[in-house]
């Protein structure tokens, strides 16, 4: 049952084939069995079981709240949750229990979703590996898959070369990929939903900026942050988006638009599409396997009658530097609120107020967070402001114009890689510092955040090592439904294989109703 889609399970709940409590208990059991992944910081077992009980009563009375009623979900631990600790994977917020729910969390609960827990991340979502939080790194479920073990010839007992999930929403990605929930909330500032989705073989969606409320999402970069959605298929993403989208009076950046439909069409006429391939994204660091799959995907669209053209986003080469300046500047501003006085950690140093401030931030933040604060403060210094921050804002405007020009030329959707490579082993990943890693991992994703566009990473095939590779589709602003419609068609063509988790496959009834795997249409050349 847990291997089915959200829509299928919703139908099963309505038909009485399974109860919300049974579903909840199965997910909780799987969370315990996969504890080694470190996907969850907090498991809200009592809360979820109580919610399941209430959902069960509604189903018995024929008063289901909708497709999400009784569906287990998880939430990244940088969204506020009433009565449940919200830490941002930081010592600064250990023990902090918010008095309110983030708008997106409340919307899920209002539709009857079951909150399984809060998922792991990089501290304050500053990272691309989900390795820098105080609760330890998240492990990629594909490390323990039959596909990876067989193709890479890894000894089943060798646990030293485990793989990262990507980040910073790695806990949410691992939770969905390991079947412990049907959907999870992530956040996306420069690729933090799409990156781990690509590495974990699931769908990661970043909505248009302003379509989904940010209220209750602990801010990193206000002008780029958006809540992200992680699911195992595009249709499930559309269902969740239909619940989350819409104006929120508590977030002035949300648009006054009707909520997006809760589903996308099953079929579409691809021949009417124009697909753009940005030439600047063909970088030397791109692995040959990802490059090959990108080319095959373009050929797939073309073979179905779509017009596929090369396009130019000329200011792409400046985007990473521009993103770094703007990101750290806003981080420095946002992190100023954590001073040890109002909430969160407070140092015991009491020599002076200044000494207490300094000690609190030294003890509460890790090196990565402190480093970004220092960088941001440097860019915002009076003597540097014009040369760095203002210039970066001007470059951002040019990057936005690049996308506008491409879409106004007739392009419907852009097709790009999501990441440079497949997931890498943790020991290899930590050889480089956080800033270098983030610059590499965000290369194809951060410009979308600066432009406020919708984007989705769709898993397309397994690498020669048996690991997932995802490709990214980028749409026009507020054309999220069209983007997901294209993504759903694309997903159907590539038929990405189901993960076979060793140790869980013995209990096939819990996860997969049949053990047959569909074969991927896109294969390595």
From Swiss-Prot:
The lineage of its organism: Eukaryota, Metazoa, Chordata, Craniata, Vertebrata. It is found in: Mitochondrion. It comes from Mus musculus (Mouse). GO terms for molecular function: ATP binding; glutaminyl-tRNA synthase (glutamine-hydrolyzing) activity. Subunit of the heterotrimeric GatCAB amidotransferase (AdT) complex, composed of A (QRSL1), B (GATB) and C (GATC) subunits. Pfam families: Amidase. Belongs to the amidase family. GatA subfamily. It comes from the Eukaryota. It catalyses: L-glutamyl-tRNA(Gln) + L-glutamine + ATP + H2O = L-glutaminyl-tRNA(Gln) + L-glutamate + ADP + phosphate + H(+). GO terms for biological process: glutaminyl-tRNAGln biosynthesis via transamidation; mitochondrial translation; regulation of protein stability. The active site is at 76 (charge relay system), 168 (charge relay system), 192 (acyl-ester intermediate). GO terms for cellular component: glutamyl-tRNA(Gln) amidotransferase complex; mitochondrion. Signal peptide: none annotated. Its main location: mitochondrion. It is an enzyme of class 6 (ligase). Keywords: ATP-binding, Ligase, Mitochondrion, Nucleotide-binding, Protein biosynthesis. Allows the formation of correctly charged Gln-tRNA(Gln) through the transamidation of misacylated Glu-tRNA(Gln) in the mitochondria. The reaction takes place in the presence of glutamine and ATP through an activated gamma-phospho-Glu-tRNA(Gln). This is Glutamyl-tRNA(Gln) amidotransferase subunit A, mitochondrial. InterPro entries: Amidase, Amidase_dom, AS_sf, GatA. Its EC number is 6.3.5.7.
